[in-house]
A protein has these predicted regions:
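Cleavable N-terminal export/targeting peptides
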Residues: 1-36
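Short coil turns and loop connectors of transmembrane beta-barrels in diderm outer membranes
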Residues: 37, 83, 98, 112-114, ...
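Repeated loop/turn-to-beta-strand initiation elements of outer-membrane beta-barrel proteins
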Residues: 41, 70-75, 114-118, 158-164
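Transmembrane beta-strand segments that form the barrel wall of outer-membrane beta-barrel proteins
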Residues: 41-49, 84-95, 166-170
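Solvent-exposed loop/turn segments connecting transmembrane beta-strands
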Residues: 49-57, 91-102, 112-114, 174-180
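Outer-membrane beta-barrel "beta-signal"
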Residues: 59-65, 181-193
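Outer-membrane beta-barrel strand-turn architecture
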Residues: 67-71, 79-81, 110-114, 156-158, ...
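Outer-membrane beta-barrel translocator/channel fold
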Residues: 119-149, 153, 160-163
Length: 193
């Protein structure tokens, strides 16, 4: 990648993130004019769970914002929850020379009781990682990838929760080049507004 290419990627990520926040904030604000724009904020860290040359070194700080423009929190049953997902927007920050991710998509939460829950999400991401098989990092093939995650969590009260999750990103062989993907596992602390 050229020096010019490296400079464009972070600027492209910033522009994409800003436009996604603006678009989602408009939807969320109109749906919940009386409520907070954000439904939940999560922060934490993850690490690569891959092995060999596909493993990423270091710890990845993470921040995720959730919006509830479809009223998922007020859904009365699982079928309503399924058709009324929350929207998430977040980042997993690469330390050292590892990939930074900016991701967005839909999230579904299943409550086992007032305290225990499971969550799944699906969407896409853009990253700053390695595209070709040049070194001991995942070769990702293209900058736009699918992003999915699953997790289990515990609510301490109506606001605070903790969740362990595993997230995977790859292009599902839809673009040319290698498809090592990135798989990270971690813990996040959440605050629900």
């Amino acid at each position: 990648m050229t020096t010019a290419g490296r400079g464009l990627m972070p600027r492209s990520l910033s522009i994409l993130l800003a436009s996604m926040i603006a678009d989602v904030s408009d939807v969320s604000a109109s749906a919940h004019a009386q409520d907070w724009i954000f439904d939940e904020l999560r922060f934490g860290a993850s690490a690569s769970v891959q092995s060999g040359g596909e493993r990423e070194d270091g710890v990845f700080p993470e921040v995720t914002i959730f919006f509830d423009p479809f009223g998922s929190d007020s859904a009365a049953n699982w079928t309503q929850k399924l058709i009324r997902p929350r929207i998430h927007l977040g980042t997993s920050i690469g330390t050292g020379s590892e990939a930074t991710q900016v991701f967005s998509g839909f999230s579904w939460t299943a409550d086992f009781n007032d305290k225990l829950f499971a969550e799944a999400g699906f969407g896409g991401l853009i990253h700053t990682g390695n595209l070709d098989e040049e070194d001991d990092r995942p070769a990702l093939g293209c900058h736009l990838l699918f992003h999915e995650y699953i997790g289990v969590g515990y609510r301490f009260d109506t606001h605070w929760n903790v969740m362990a999750q595993v997230a995977h990103s790859s292009h599902a062989n839809l673009c040319d080049g290698p498809n090592d993907g990135m798989t990270r596992a971690g813990v996040q602390i959440g605050y629900k507004f």
